Amino acid sequence: VRTIDTHCNNLCNQAIRVEAIDEPGCGGANHKYNIIGPSRQMLGVGEVPTFGLNIRFQDGPLKEAGVNGVTNEALLAVLIDRMRGFQRGPFACDENAAVLTALETAMAILHARTQRRDKAGVEGTHGKAPGDGAFVDLEADAMPNEAIRVPIKQTGIVGMGADAAEAGA
């Protein structure tokens, strides 16, 4: 079990435990995560988490394994919907707008990746397409706009930071 703490920016998030609970697969990413709320005393039961969520991501190529878990795109769709809701509500702000733009950009990049792999005839398989493996490890301390600049340029999608300024966004 590997504990993830990149969300721990306030008391609420510090009380929520995020864990990768399996070993990384052949692509380098984990497939199973737990998100667990703080524990409370339950009469006759003991300490129990106030909530828990088990997330299982797609494991294996679609053409071989079938649909057996959620996708990054499905979770992004939830976050995009939530941020759009906040932007329609009384707490709309510049930060929420920036988050929404980043999430929508991430979704567009994932869609572009799927289209590139589909065009190469390898989508849904472990086969490699031109461009796979071209983007290697990011530094853990990379700034978010630096982290997405390379894939955005590779896909031709205009995003945040200097790329957006160059495009006149």
Where do the language-model regions lie?
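Signature of extracytoplasmic/envelope-associated structural regions
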Residues: 21, 113-131, 135, 161
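Long, low-complexity intrinsically disordered regions enriched in Ser/Thr, Asp/Glu, Pro/Gly
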Residues: 132-169
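Polar low-complexity intrinsically disordered regions enriched in Ser/Thr and small residues
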Residues: 28-31, 40, 47-49, 127-130, ...
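Short, compact, well-ordered microdomains
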Residues: 81, 86-124
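A detector of low-complexity, intrinsically disordered, Ser/Thr/Gly/Pro/Ala-rich segments
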Residues: 1-4, 94, 123, 153
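Short, charged/polar N-terminal "headpieces" of proteins
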Residues: 1-42
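Acidic/polar, glycine-rich intrinsically disordered N-terminal extensions of enzymes
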Residues: 46-47, 98, 168
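A short, structured beta-strand/loop element
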Residues: 30-86
